[in-house]
From Swiss-Prot:
Residue ranges of the region described as Disordered: 189-331, 369-444, 554-664, 678-705
GO biological process: neuron differentiation
GO molecular function: DNA-binding transcription factor activity, RNA polymerase II-specific; RNA polymerase II cis-regulatory region sequence-specific DNA binding
Name under which the protein is recorded: Homeobox protein engrailed
Cystine bridges: none
Length: 799
């Protein structure tokens, strides 16, 4: 039957109750799946190639399987299970004594959970046992043709790095529900995202130091491939041997306190419990004593099966053959113990070494023949391990080279501080494969790329700078902010010209003060307005780009500030007019306002004519000015009032500044403040028509107010001296008077108060002084001696 190893390209196919599963050629070439199990649910409308693959995918789906993670079914009570490697150390429960539990737990616990797959038909261990039978001795196959120890170790290292990456962001805390005081519970991100109702519990119990039983051996494939998934109806079909699990003594259970020798049981201690992460029968668990017997079982005959197993024997025969082989291997095979170096019967050892530090796991010689244990003893596997080789595969244990380098997990690079073998040892040679590091982040990939994309597609982003208050150090804080939150928009670059490809030269000194102007490439500047090329101009605010846009970007400014005169070096040195100044010296002067007077001995006839016209106009202007002065003096002599005013004025000393005169004289003339047009001097004196004398009968009688009306008007006047329209209407209705009568009474009342107080309007007094007051009150003021003009003079001045 064709197996999954024949798939060369990526192929998608559907299987029951799942959406889509994709397999790539790299995972298929590793051939971890072996032969698909039999007895599963029937698959319809699938080819001979896809049918075994879909059945195998349904039984073995996990983090490290060749199958991509797929969408889990909502109706299933078992989820697609959080990653088994997400916790460096799982919770040790005394109530459980098996490696994995197949019963789905419908509880509200937050433990990291996974499930063991049901073993149906032939698995990888069955294939190995069948391949070691005499029926296949002449086939020429080699055990584990494609699954060598280096590949298994590579999977283990990937598992280790994924665990460490996820433990960094996990919640590590004490679990009060556990009896063991040092038990630590880790909740990683996948475990938080996994629904509680769709999960199965994993518990680590004590493991007996003996040959692997059928239940433990059945988990071999699941430990290599990750964690599988099953439905509810398949839970009852599990092939775990519960009797063997119950036979394990409580005194021999795994105890967390054993880890105290190597380090505290926390993920940050730097120690990985391989036994807590892989089954004891797995070849990945190199520290388990039972693993040696399993390895001897794998390589006992010297012949094996490859990726194409064509045996047609029944499943029952294979299972029985496996049991017999395992019992024989347990009784007959005795090898040196990896812990104490002595021969231990039954694969047991007094000192049980289950932990390796991260430094030891990352050593290049880890897993090789010369690997040194944690206590310094050399781990020497059996001779069968070193001599097994064939033309198709490379030796697994005899190769001194390793596919792994010492890697510092904090810096993600090689670290000399980590323990590594000396350069003289044969195991310290260069590795044939690249060193194993954690996945490179997107930001690191972006930093390695060139800035051509920025120069071509992200032009103009230099105008949108953040305020300096948010980022005190723009060259670093802005890069960190954008690189952390928007890695694909503006990645941090070391060259400022890459970040600001077409910025203006005068702004570069403000954005990057340390950048010299000589580094600017003029070919990258496509537009630079004329008034922005001055290097001496300072920006209005920090990182203000309003000048670049030609408008103000700050709404709180009503109008943009006026441009200051351009300052250049040497502007304070005003040139002095020197004889024989040439045009060249005039061009070098930077101050256009102060120019030296150029004197040339030879002048053209046109220049003479212009000079004559200028002289004539100047002489005419001087004559007109002299005439005005004479007229003014004559008018002052003829006018005695003006003489008196001139005599009353105080003559300011010659050294008095004009500012004092401005303080005394008002800025605006008084007539500007006149509210009536007739008060202005342009209107002239007010002309009044002569009124004809009226007879006694034609005179309008004065309004006789009653006592009540007068008292009410006085009260209203005391409250407010000015009437509003509504108030005037209400008073007219209440008192039985007209609105005009009430308005006139209020006006008369205000005039009497002003006259009795004797305080005159300062504006009127100022107008009277200037001879601009045209009312008849001038006569009264002149009679009282308050106005200096006579009535005739006032009329003459006003005219």
């Amino acid at each position: 039957m064709e197996t999954i190893g024949f798939m060369k390209n990526i192929e998608t196919f559907a299987f029951p109750k799942q959406e889509t599963v994709a397999m790539d050629d790299r995972a298929a070439a590793s051939n971890f799946l072996g032969q698909p199990p039999v007895g599963g649910p029937p698959v319809k409308d699938l080819s001979a190639l896809k049918r075994p693959a879909s059945e195998m995918v349904k039984s073995h789906v996990g983090l490290f399987s060749p199958v991509k993670r797929r969408r889990h079914c909502g109706h299933s009570s078992v989820s697609d299970l959080a990653r088994s490697a997400s916790c460096v150390r799982s919770l040790a429960m005394k109530a459980k004594n098996t490696w994995m539990s197949n019963v789905p737990v419908m509880s509200s616990t937050h433990l990291v959970k996974r499930e063991c797959p049901p073993v149906q038909g032939a698995d990888l261990s069955d294939n190995l046992a069948t391949a070691s039978s005499p029926a296949h001795t002449g086939k020429g196959y080699t055990p584990f043709e494609d699954i060598c120890l280096k590949q298994l170790l590579e999977v283990s290292r990937h598992k280790l790095f994924r665990s460490l990456e996820e433990v960094r962001g996990s919640d590590v805390r004490h679990d009060s529900r556990c009896d063991v005081p040092r038990a630590v519970r880790c909740r990683s991100l996948p475990s938080r995202m996994t629904p509680e109702k769709n999960s199965a519990e994993v518990s680590i119990g004590g493991l007996k130091d003996q040959s692997p039983s059928t239940s433990i051996r059945s988990n071999l494939v699941s430990s290599l491939l990750g964690v599988s998934r099953r439905d509810d109806q398949e839970t009852s079909d599990s092939c775990h041997d519960d009797d063997d699990d119950r036979a394990i003594n409580d005194s021999e259970r795994y105890d967390v306190s054993e880890c105290d020798e190597s380090g505290p049981p926390t993920p940050s201690s730097g120690f990985i419990d391989i036994e807590a992460d892989t089954p004891p029968c797995s070849p990945l668990n190199l520290t388990t004593t039972g693993g040696d017997s399993v390895s001897q079982l794998f390589h006992s005959s010297g012949h094996g099966v490859g990726d194409r197993q064509r045996n047609t024997a029944s499943t029952d025969a294979k299972s029985s053959h496996i049991k017999s082989k395992s019992e024989d291997a347990t009784k007959d095979k005795l090898g040196p113990c990896c812990c104490c170096g002595t021969t231990c019967s039954g694969g047991t050892c007094k000192e049980k070494k289950t932990n390796f530090s991260i430094d030891a796991i990352l050593r290049p010689d880890f897993g090789s023949g010369n690997f040194l244990g944690q206590d310094g003893h050399t781990f020497q596997p059996n001779e069968d391990h070193q001599t097994v080789s064939s033309a198709q595969t490379t030796p697994r244990f005899s190769s001194p080279d390793s596919a792994f380098k010492v890697v510092d997990l904090r810096t993600r690079s090689r670290s000399e501080s980590l323990s590594s073998p000396s350069s003289s040892s044969s195991s310290s040679r260069s590795s044939p494969s690249p060193p194993l590091t954690s996945p490179v982040s997107l930001r690191q990939k972006w930093e390695r790329q060139t800035g051509s994309f920025m120069r071509r597609h992200l032009k103009g982003q230099e105008h949108f700078n953040f305020p300096q208050s948010l980022f005190p150090n723009p060259s670093k804080d802005l890069e960190n902010f954008i690189g952390r939150d928007f890695p694909f928009i503006s990645p941090p670059q070391g060259n400022p010209l890459v970040k600001f490809p077409n910025i203006f030269p005068d702004q570069l000194s403000h954005l990057h003060p340390a950048m010299p102007a000589e580094c600017v490439d003029p070919r990258t500047f496509y537009y630079a307005p004329e008034n922005f090329l001055s290097k001496g101009q300072q920006p209005l605010l920090s990182y203000d780009m309003s000048k670049l846009f030609g408008r103000s970007l700050h709404p709180f400014l009503n109008s943009p500030p006026k441009p200051q005169p351009q300052k250049r070096p040497g502007h304070h040195l005003a040139p002095t007019p020197v004889e024989g100044v040439t045009l060249k010296s005039v061009g070098t002067n930077h101050n256009p306002k102060v120019l030296p007077e150029v004197k040339t001995p030879v002048q053209s006839p046109q220049g003479d004519q212009k000079k004559r016209s200028r002289d004539e106009s100047a002489s005419k202007g001087k004559q007109v000015a002299d005439q005005n002065v004479h007229l003014k003096e004559n008018s002052q002599k003829s006018d005695p009032v003006l003489k008196q005013e001139k005599g009353n004025r105080k003559v300011s000393p010659a050294g008095a500044s004009p500012e004092t005169d401005k303080a005394k004289n008002p800025l605006w003339p008084a007539w500007v403040f006149c509210t009536r047009y007739s008060d202005r001097p342009s209107s002239g004196p007010r002309s009044r028509k002569p009124k004809r004398s009226k007879a006694q009968d034609e005179k309008r009688p004065r309004t006789a107010f009653t006592n009540d009306q007068l008292q009410r008007l006085k009260r209203e006047f005391d409250e407010c001296r000015y009437l509003t329209e509504t108030r005037r209407k209400n008073l007219a209705d209440e008192l039985g008077l007209t609105e005009s009568q009430i308005k006139i009474w209020f006006q008369n009342k205000r005039a009497k108060i002003k006259k009795s107080v004797g305080v005159r309007n300062p504006l009127a007094l100022q107008l009277m002084e200037q001879g601009l007051y045209n009312h008849s009150t001038i006569k009264e003021m002149m009679e009282e001696g308050m106005y200096p003009h006579t009535p005739s003079q006032a009329g003459d001045d006003s005219s």
